Amino acid sequence: YLKLRTSYGLTGNDEIGGDRFMYDQEYIYTSDYFLGTTSKNHTIRGLMQGRLANPDISWEKERKFNIGFETNLLGKLDISFDYFYNRRFDILCIPSRNIPSYIGADMPYMNLGKTKNQGFEASIRWSDNIGKKIQYFAQLDGWMAKNKILYNSESIQTEDYFYRTG
């Protein structure tokens, strides 16, 4: 037999860590801003602006493509091969651009990152019998994958080998 297969799809990743409300402005109740004390000598703390909001934020996305086949020859030799190509985009990053400290807030998360991942998996298996009571098989598996960060919003580095992009 010979079986051919292929698939294509768009998936999303909502596993974004602890900052669930990146679309909303946050304010932090902190002792960094001292407003004074009460008559009973209790400290009055203030609010500090946190990371800037991004109302256009969305989940990370990935386009996935896979093509492959499997076959059996002579009832004893199984061969399978798969090629895959995945492209992730809109990966959440904090932009490397600096904003003046007098703004008093950090840059927001943005959907800027891009990666690609491609490779293959292959398998060859021979199975047979010796008489009626002994069965054996030999199998060889192999794979190769190549991952590349296409964009990661990194700061300017002094040497090229410091960059994770590329």
Q: Each predicted region: which residue ranges?
A:
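Extracellular/periplasmic, surface-exposed regions of secreted and cell-surface proteins
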Residues: 1-166
